[in-house]
């Protein structure tokens, strides 16, 4: 790192003194320092930018006696470079020239006018249109964690109180923030170190009273009771820090952030981090979007609909009424044949949600207002399309769309049909909107007629037939004459520029007209900018209603999308039951059936309190994992309001979905594959309930055969006896197929395969009963394992089977059972003993406990 001597600023040049002062105020950010047509970076900023952006590192003379490392980028290309930087979690402070170079005696006055951080983006060019861009803050307390997220591009502000590390990990994965703020005393850095855009914040920013005042000021309320979050102390501390950061970086009012919502885990099906990862909901195991549930379900018409759909996928509902409202809305859109018309209308809306954020931040561009005008034009058509609907949710959404005739009329009168990108270019305000602007424009636009007239007049008076009148931005207006005829120009012509074959002149008349035209152009542009700012003032009073319009349109987009997916992919409306159980007829995996070249084999599943665990056996590649995942995905799809890939589905009450699927280590945490597997298994055994859906795949394969078998048997038995969760338990330990003989609620099913000689055909069909064998050697042969190895494996297999046969003859019915006896009942006496702290007991209390332990020991015998 370059050490910059700032103790004596007089050593540095005036420009570098200015730079160092601005850099000191933004030490953790790259400072883009405007120099003419470039943004320049110096010292360590230059070195880092050179590495991150692949730009040249040079030097700019010396200051304070030392060379100045420098890198630069053209100002007109800045958005592309900013996109690269924020994508890797880097923040940037943009410093512009705000003074007039003509009147500045020293360095031109400069000021940081914009701060760009990964979590506070609103610029369309920097955002991914189909993904929420969240700023998050995290605070650790004695009772758990406070967590807050803000999407500044929509104003969505959500807080949560999370009791455990596992809950926090799941929430971090669900929200996937672009930038995360955490306090100085946060201890579990292992959890967040691999995340992009993490920012350490001083402890005082999490001060409770300071945070409350910040939130009250933002919402303009006397207290927070109306938001239902007053008891969420840790969450409020996180929210307050987040709010402080946004105010510091945005440097303006934030009227679109007008409410705060508490995320309540009890209102949605809980999915832990492993489950979200294993089910590949919105991100596949490689980090991409292809072949995920969202990839299949998302044919939404608008970016805001796509983002809302991803939130729905990660927050499957438990509220039966809301789920059924969504299902019935989708049904009506199909029955009335409205979904295609609605989809086409919504496609023209654009991203109203993010346009509203830019309106609130006064950073909207002319084309944003043009899109808003188009959206408001379409609004009556959308409402007319849905006018025949009877379904309550659709009727509510039509009302929430609202009516904006005055705002539509304003934009229609004010904005031209195809405006330029930036207001600084002018030509945004429509002719007829403002009389004064029309007058200034008329004066400046009349220049072409005047120049034609002047050229004809001067040609006639001078007799110079090559004479031309023209204009360029550098030299202004001029009269051009070929060099051969330049000796014929009048004395009133003053030479302005000499070119290779021509001379250019100015006359007093042309100079006077130039000043008049340029003045009118400047005044027209200044007035146009003033009228542009007034449009914000006229639209902002309707901001909340316009945000509501965007939210309602996004939900309509999802519902019409669900209808389209159902018709295209032959999905059926699931029946939601209040009973415990899952009954699916001819279910299909929504992703695999779309990417598979062969016809997908549909399979049933029946899980009830009397049939609560299926032991799933069958060959490798037979489809066990696909079968289990499809049950979870169908269940989840039903709970977001989507139709499902099945002939019929009845889905009961579900509180959580757990998965223990796949094998991977966690090198960053120093955890082996087996340790990861056991950690996930422990989480399931501790937290699953009778209303949970549990998928367990190949438990115990990461250790020795007997250890693995013992763990798999015990985990399955515990889930069946102690938890009673609805469970799919896939295994290659055939000993587990004897569990149904001990536990009547456990059932064997298998994925069918047909063996012919040394080949195998996978039928992918689920049948009742246990599989006869695992076909591991046949699968190995298909994978290309050398024939000599397969031959040796067959020989070894026969040896092992003969040994097992000998063992079983000693006790043919009970050998496997005796190896794995049922789990003993927990000892009440030992549990009580574990709760006692002997250092805190009086003699009398110790004697009382001794009698109690004696009594409990008899209870267990």
From Swiss-Prot:
Keywords noted in UniProt: ATP-binding, DNA damage, DNA repair, DNA-binding, Nucleotide-binding
Lineage: superkingdom? Bacteria
Pfam families, alphabetized: MutS_I (PF01624), MutS_II (PF05188), MutS_III (PF05192), MutS_IV (PF05190), MutS_V (PF00488)
Q: Name one GO molecular function term.
A: mismatched DNA binding
Q: Which SUPFAM superfamilies match?
A: DNA repair protein MutS, domain I, DNA repair protein MutS, domain II, DNA repair protein MutS, domain III, P-loop containing nucleoside triphosphate hydrolases
Keyword ATP-binding present in the record's keywords: the answer is yes
Q: Where does ATP bind?
A: 618-625
What GO biological process terms are annotated to this protein in UniProt?
Answer: mismatch repair
Q: Does the keyword Zinc apply?
A: no
Q: Name one GO cellular component term.
A: cytosol
Provide the family line: Belongs to the DNA mismatch repair MutS family.
HAMAP family recorded for this chain?
MutS (MF_00096)
Q: What does this protein do?
A: This protein is involved in the repair of mismatches in DNA. It is possible that it carries out the mismatch recognition step. This protein has a weak ATPase activity.
- Protein's recorded name: DNA mismatch repair protein MutS
Q: What is the lineage of its organism?
A: Bacteria, Pseudomonadati, Pseudomonadota, Gammaproteobacteria, Alteromonadales
């Amino acid at each position: 790192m370059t050490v910059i001597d700032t103790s004596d600023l007089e050593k540095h040049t005036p420009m570098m003194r200015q730079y160092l002062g601005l850099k000191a105020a933004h030490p953790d950010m790259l400072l883009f320092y405007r120099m003419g047509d470039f943004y320049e970076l110096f010292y360590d900023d230059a070195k880092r930018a050179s590495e991150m952006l692949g730009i040249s590192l040079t030097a700019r003379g010396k200051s304070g006696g030392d060379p100045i490392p420098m890198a630069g980028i053209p100002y007109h290309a800045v958005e592309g470079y900013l996109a690269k930087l924020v994508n890797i979690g880097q923040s940037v402070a943009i410093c512009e020239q705000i003074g007039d170079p003509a009147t500045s005696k020293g360095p031109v006055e400069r000021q940081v006018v914009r701060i760009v951080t990964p979590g506070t983006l609103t610029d369309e060019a920097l955002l991914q249109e189909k993904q929420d861009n969240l700023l998050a803050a995290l605070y650790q307390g004695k009772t758990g964690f406070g967590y807050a997220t803000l999407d500044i591009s929509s104003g969505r502000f959500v807080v949560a109180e999370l009791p455990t590390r596992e809950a926090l990990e799941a929430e971090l994965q669900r929200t996937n923030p672009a930038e995360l703020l955490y306090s100085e005393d946060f201890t579990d850095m292992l959890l967040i170190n691999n995340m992009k855009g993490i920012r350490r914040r001083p402890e005082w920013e999490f001060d409770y009273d300071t945070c409350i005042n910040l939130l009250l000021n933002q919402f303009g309320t006397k207290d927070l009771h109306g938001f239902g979050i007053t008891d969420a102390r840790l969450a409020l501390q996180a929210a307050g820090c987040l709010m402080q950061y946004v105010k510091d970086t945005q440097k303006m009012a934030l009227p679109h952030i007008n409410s705060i919502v508490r995320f309540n885990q009890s209102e949605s099906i809980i999915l832990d981090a492993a489950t979200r990862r294993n089910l590949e909901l919105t991100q596949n195991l490689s980090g991409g979007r292809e072949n995920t549930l969202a990839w299949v379900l998302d044919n939404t018409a608008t970016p805001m609909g796509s983002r809302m759909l991803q939130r729905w996928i990660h927050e499957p509902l438990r509220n039966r009424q809301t789920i059924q409202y969504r299902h019935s809305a989708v049904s009506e859109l199909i029955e009335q044949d409205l979904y295609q018309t609605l989809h086409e209308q919504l496609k023209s809306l654009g991203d109203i949600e993010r346009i509203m954020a830019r309106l609130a931040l006064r950073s909207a561009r002319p084309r944003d207002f043009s899109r808003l005008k188009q959206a408001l034009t379409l609004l009556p058509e959308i409402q007319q399309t849905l006018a025949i609907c009877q379904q309550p949710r659709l009727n509510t959404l039509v009302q929430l769309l609202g009516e904006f005739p005055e705002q539509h009329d304003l934009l229609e009168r004010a904005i031209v049909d195809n405006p330029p990108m930036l207001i600084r270019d002018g030509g945004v305000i429509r002719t007829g909107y403002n009389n004064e602007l029309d007058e200034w424009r008329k004066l400046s636009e009349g220049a072409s007629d005047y120049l034609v007239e002047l050229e004809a007049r001067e040609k006639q008076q001078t007799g110079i037939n090559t004479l031309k009148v023209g204009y360029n931005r550098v030299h202004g207006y001029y009269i051009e004459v070929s060099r051969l005829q330049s000796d014929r120009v009048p004395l009133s012509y003053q030479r302005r520029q000499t070119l290779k074959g021509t001379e250019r002149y100015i006359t007093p008349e042309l100079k006077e007209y130039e000043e008049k035209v340029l003045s009118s152009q400047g005044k027209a542009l200044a007035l146009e900018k003033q009228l542009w700012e007034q449009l914000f003032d006229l639209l902002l009073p309707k901001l909340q209603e316009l945000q509501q319009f965007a939210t309602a349109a996004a939900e309509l987009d999802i519902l019409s999308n669900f209808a389209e997916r159902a018709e295209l992919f032959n999905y059926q409306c699931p029946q939601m039951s209040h009973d415990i159980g899952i009954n699916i007829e001819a279910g299909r995996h929504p992703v695999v059936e779309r990417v598979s070249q062969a016809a997908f084999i549909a399979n049933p599943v029946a899980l009830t309190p009397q049939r609560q665990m299926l032991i799933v056996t069958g060959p490798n590649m037979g489809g066990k994992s696909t079968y289990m995942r499809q049950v979870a995905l169908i269940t989840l799809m039903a709970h977001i309001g989507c139709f499902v890939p099945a002939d019929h589905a009845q889905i009961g009450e579900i509180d959580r979905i757990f998965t223990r699927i796949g094998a991977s280590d966690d090198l960053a945490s120093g955890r082996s594959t087996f340790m990861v597997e056991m950690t996930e298994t422990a989480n399931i055994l501790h937290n699953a309930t009778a209303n949970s859906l549990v998928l367990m795949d190949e438990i115990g394969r990461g250790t020795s055969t007997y250890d693995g078998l013992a763990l798999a048997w015990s985990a399955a038995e515990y889930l069946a006896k102690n938890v009673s969760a609805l469970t799919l338990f896939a295994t290659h330990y055939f000993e587990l197929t004897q569990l149904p003989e001990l536990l009547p609620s456990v059932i064997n099913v298998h994925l069918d395969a047909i063996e012919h000689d040394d080949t195998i055909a996978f039928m992918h069909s689920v049948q009742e009963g246990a599989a006869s064998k695992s076909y591991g050697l046949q699968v190995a042969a298909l994978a290309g394992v050398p024939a000599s190895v397969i031959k040796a494996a067959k020989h070894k297999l026969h040896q092992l089977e003969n040994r097992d046969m000998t063992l079983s003859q000693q006790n043919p019915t009970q050998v496997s059972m005796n190896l794995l006896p049922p789990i003993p009942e927990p000892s009440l006496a030992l549990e009580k003993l574990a709760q006692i702290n002997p250092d805190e007991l009086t003699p009398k209390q110790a004697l009382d406990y001794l009698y109690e332990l004696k009594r409990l020991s008899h209870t267990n015998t």
